[in-house]
Regions:
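Cytosolic/stromal cytosol-facing helical appendages immediately following the last transmembrane segment
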Residues: 3-135
Length: 135
């Protein structure tokens, strides 16, 4: 059970790292869209994992059967499949080296839209040469 829960949580971390649904003027989160989770369109891996790496389609359309999950160009793309991302996800410096630039690129440099741990926010803004605002 420990192994299963741990694997589930690591994959969940990989699928959503740095991504954040924005709030509207009423404080409600925007509808879940394909750009709110990371995908990987590797055909072989998707066959073995029942299209799990087309995670964005699953979130945007939760009732769609796994066989029909689609690729979305607007969904952010992981550099490798889940199996290749497991070990880096457990080593923060390695993971940061792989993923932080991708989060930055996904939000077109506007890290105020990214999901960043409050204690690491200033460091990440400085890493990309951005002015840090505590607001």
């Amino acid at each position: 059970a420990f192994y299963g829960v741990s694997l589930f949580e690591i994959i969940n971390y990989i699928e959503h790292y740095g991504l954040l649904r924005q709030k509207d003027v009423n404080g409600k989160y925007e509808r879940v869209l394909p750009e709110h989770s990371w995908n990987n369109n590797n055909i072989v891996t998707n066959l073995f994992l029942y299209q799990l790496q087309r995670h964005s389609d699953h979130h945007a359309f939760p009732t769609r059967p796994f066989q029909a999950l689609r690729h979305f160009d607007e969904a952010p793309e992981l550099p490798n499949g889940y199996a290749s991302m497991l070990l880096p996800a457990l080593i923060p410096a390695w993971w940061s080296k792989i993923m932080d630039q991708r989060v930055f690129d996904h939000y077109k440099g506007d890290l105020s839209k990214a999901n960043i741990h409050p204690k690491k926010r200033k460091k990440i803004f400085e890493k990309f040469g951005l002015a840090f605002n505590r607001d």
